[in-house]
Amino acid sequence: MTKPSILVMAGGTGGHIFPGLAVAEYLRICGWNVSWLGNQSGMEYRLVKSCNFPFEAVEFGGLRGKGIKAKLMLPINLARACHQSWKIMRRLKPNVVLGMGGYITFPGGLISKLLKRPLVLHEANSVAGSANRALAKIAMRTLTGFPNTMENAEWVGNPIRQEFDDIAAPAERYEQRQGPLSLLVVGGSLGAAALNENIPAALALIPLEQRPTVIHQAGDKHLLDLQKRYADLGVLADIRPFIEDMPTAYAQADLVICRSGAMTVSELAACGVASCLIPFPHAIDDHQTANAQFLSDADAAVFLPQKNLNPQDLALMIQNLTRTDLKEMAVRAHALSKPHATQRVAEVCADCAGVGI
């Protein structure tokens, strides 16, 4: 019996790639043949190859922030990408095509329609990206990571690693804790300077007996500067370039201060952990603000725009939050999670392909 096959399309950012990899791995375990369409010069190439999925390269990029030359070349570049996608799909003959977002999905989505291959879309952010908005008109099914993102779409949540869903319930975790609060800071790569500048200064304003313990993920690029800043301010902190086991780090934290990318917000909800979300202000379509408000509107997180970020107010916020407050916030966040998102996306793909998982 021939195995069912899927072509996953995603690229550009981790918010598109990582949920695609979660679905790809799930379907591979279920016995599907999985291939990936992406840009060989994008971050998806390294990530997908490291997971041992066949990679099909298409040359196509976005227009936002590009000059007039890129816009003038769009028809030629799109035609080339469509031709490449056509050859790939004619050869692979996938039972279903899954677009997870990013400009690279646009030519492949068009060709899936021409070749009468079922197209399923998944939008990770609270604000739909350009490619998904355009392709939604021809997709068989549209799925979203957040509610009320696109018309005629099913809110399934964002596919994440199973380890995030396996953590003990927040009420159980928080009730067992005593002593100073545990603070986890995830600086990320986008605009980390604002967090790295203000958070150590805020902690220095908190009296020693009230000061939380701190783990700060800095990234390799900012590690030495951040170590010096904490030391100069006399604040003891565990500063790491990277946290390998993020589910455990979330589970052990009382409060997380971080950006609000789609996957981060979904992981916070899955784990059930209180957070202070500081959206990256220059994200496309300001989607990080909308992502953060998904939790903050339900009193499941503190929403702090970067323009309002300063050490004095941040220190006051941390001091005013009790562990009981944080537990209640974490419980509300957990109630918004979609623990079976990966399975649901896979089920929809199988349904559109007319086969079982």
From Swiss-Prot:
Cellular component GO terms, alphabetical: plasma membrane
Binding site for UDP-N-acetyl-alpha-D-glucosamine: T13, G14, G15, N125, R161, S189, I243, Q288
Enzyme kind, highest EC tier: transferase
Catalytic reaction equation(s): di-trans,octa-cis-undecaprenyl diphospho-N-acetyl-alpha-D-muramoyl-L-alanyl-D-glutamyl-meso-2,6-diaminopimeloyl-D-alanyl-D-alanine + UDP-N-acetyl-alpha-D-glucosamine = di-trans,octa-cis-undecaprenyl diphospho-[N-acetyl-alpha-D-glucosaminyl-(1->4)]-N-acetyl-alpha-D-muramoyl-L-alanyl-D-glutamyl-meso-2,6-diaminopimeloyl-D-alanyl-D-alanine + UDP + H(+)
Pfam families according to UniProt: Glyco_tran_28_C, Glyco_transf_28
Pathway where it operates: Cell wall biogenesis; peptidoglycan biosynthesis
EC number(s) on file: 2.4.1.227
GO terms assigned for molecular function: UDP-N-acetyl-D-glucosamine:N-acetylmuramoyl-L-alanyl-D-glutamyl-meso-2,6-diaminopimelyl-D-alanyl-D-alanine-diphosphoundecaprenol 4-beta-N-acetylglucosaminlytransferase activity; undecaprenyldiphospho-muramoylpentapeptide beta-N-acetylglucosaminyltransferase activity
UniProt superkingdom: Bacteria
Compartments where found: Cell inner membrane
An annotated GO BP: cell wall organization
Signal sequence interval, chain numbering: none
Keyword entries, A-Z: Cell cycle, Cell division, Cell inner membrane, Cell membrane, Cell shape, Cell wall biogenesis/degradation, Glycosyltransferase, Membrane, Peptidoglycan synthesis, Transferase
Topological type in the membrane: Peripheral membrane protein
PANTHER family found in the cross-reference section: GLYCOSYLTRANSFERASE, UDP-N-ACETYLGLUCOSAMINE--N-ACETYLMURAMYL-(PENTAPEPTIDE) PYROPHOSPHORYL-UNDECAPRENOL N-ACETYLGLUCOSAMINE TRANSFERASE 1
HAMAP family in the cross-refs: MurG
Entry-linked NCBIfam families: murG
Assigned protein family: Belongs to the glycosyltransferase 28 family. MurG subfamily.
Functional summary from the UniProt entry: Cell wall formation. Catalyzes the transfer of a GlcNAc subunit on undecaprenyl-pyrophosphoryl-MurNAc-pentapeptide (lipid intermediate I) to form undecaprenyl-pyrophosphoryl-MurNAc-(pentapeptide)GlcNAc (lipid intermediate II).
Protein name per its UniProtKB record: UDP-N-acetylglucosamine--N-acetylmuramyl-(pentapeptide) pyrophosphoryl-undecaprenol N-acetylglucosamine transferase
Organism taxonomic ancestry: Bacteria, Pseudomonadati, Pseudomonadota, Betaproteobacteria, Burkholderiales
Gene coding for it: murG
